[in-house]
Amino acid sequence: MSLSKTKNPALLAGPGDEAKEKVQAALELLHKFGSAFKVDTAGFSFHPESPECDKIFGAYLKNVKHVPTYSSAKTLTSVGGRILYAATCQYVKLTPVTNLTGCTLWEHGWGQNLKCYHGEGMCRKKNEIEMAATSESGVAALKEGRGAVEINRWGRQVVKITQENYVICMEDLQSRFNQPSANSCGLSFSDSDKARSAMENATELTRSIFSQAKMDHLLFMPICCYCNYGGKMILGRQLCKLTPFSISGTEGLREEDVSPVQAVSVRHPAVFVFQCCNATGGSKGKTSCDFKISHADLLQVLNLVRKMWLEVMGYPMPIHFPRFKWSPSLRVKNALLPEGSVNEDENPFGLDNSEDEEEVVPPSPPSPARKRTRTTVAEVHHKKKKKIVLESSEEDE
């Protein structure tokens, strides 16, 4: 593992030579993990944006055979790789310039009222959604009894869903649906009751898995998707989209028939799912990354990375997750910037280069205006009298 193969660790702080020595120590540590789980580490560079730690955790995850809940396999390995990378940095005393775990601890303060990322109470606002009667979402809404067929103002048949428990950030009270204001944190829930159930699930699940941790008032969550990892600023929301998903099939289950961890989801059949900051839900003309992980799987990923570290190193993993603090930089960026594709044609405007350029003669400077003198009547008589005197004097000579 030669340092000549390493990329410039732009997200890592420290003097050049000292940072290189620490990167070399980190590469040796990853080689140790790779040997334990049969991962080739010959070309590793320990760059923050390289998926090297993802490969190591992915190999470990395959042996565990974890069944995800609303999470993609790619996101599970990515988040596990981020945590392993941050732990390795802390082990070799290499200080990143940003939070490379991509995760944080949010002191949500939820009680009787739900609060947004500003720390203020969320506002309830009635919201109505119209969908085509033949669309997949419209048919699903009718089957679930969430919508009704109506004729809209354009005379079209639509499925109308009325969200009575829709809550939004206080800064979006005067904004239209799904169009957050410039001061918004971007947090909203279509069903406040389901969101509350998901938060109760998260609290009790954390208590069940990490029984010694005092986390009743904190939510462990990712804040970076693939779009803004590493402290990047993007258009739109700056924090992962937080959505409560229902856990189906819990009807008829008794808590005593399942494990204590599973019993949490029987009592509170909803779970938070974190997605791309600007997840579009399949909207045309918009793109989003495929980041998707549930809170339950996020806890399991942290647990598995800790177990993996303990198996290889023989002692607990060093890791630190910062507290979430609201900052104006996390507000929704609503700038409308012009887009366009790059055209590499040499002559896109059809200029004829064979034609000689006409010589441009600079215009001559304007001549100064002559000053017109004004002659009075007295001056005219004086000149005539002077002329007569001159003529008479010539005759005398």
Swiss-Prot record:
Gene3D superfamilies: Adenovirus DNA-binding, C-terminal domain superfamily/Adenovirus DNA-binding, zinc binding domain, Adenovirus DNA-binding, N-terminal domain
Species name: Snake adenovirus serotype 1 (SnAdV-1)
Similarity comment: family membership: Belongs to the adenoviridae E2A DNA-binding protein family.
Binding residue positions for Zn(2+) 2: 225, 227, 276, 289
Region feature Disordered, mapped onto this chain: 338-397
BP GO annotations: DNA replication; DNA-templated transcription; positive regulation of DNA replication; viral DNA strand displacement replication
Transmembrane segments: none
Region (Flexible loop): 129-161
Subcellular location, record wording: Host nucleus
A Pfam family per the record: Viral_DNA_Zn_bi
Self-association state and partner proteins as the record states: Homomultimerizes on viral ssDNA bound to pTP. Forms a initiation complex with viral polymerase, pTP and hosts NFIA and POU2F1/OCT1. Interacts with host SRCAP.
Keywords recorded for this protein, A-Z: DNA replication, DNA-binding, Early protein, Host nucleus, Host-virus interaction, Metal-binding, Phosphoprotein, Viral DNA replication, Zinc
Domain commentary: The C-terminal arm bridges DBP molecules together, thereby creating a chain.
Binding site for Zn(2+) 1: 116, 118, 169, 185
Gene Ontology terms: cellular component: host cell nucleus; viral capsid
UniProt region (C-terminal arm, DBP binding), positions on chain: 335-397
Bias-annotated ranges (Acidic residues): 342-360
Record's protein name: DNA-binding protein
Function text: Plays a role in the elongation phase of viral strand displacement replication by unwinding the template in an ATP-independent fashion, employing its capacity to form multimers. Also enhances the rate of initiation. Released from template upon second strand synthesis. Assembles in complex with viral pTP, viral pol, host NFIA and host POU2F1/OCT1 on viral origin of replication. Covers the whole ssDNA genome during synthesis. The complementary strand synthesis induces its relese from DNA template. May inhibit cellular transcription mediated by the interaction between host SRCAP and CBP.
Gene Ontology MF: a single term: zinc ion binding
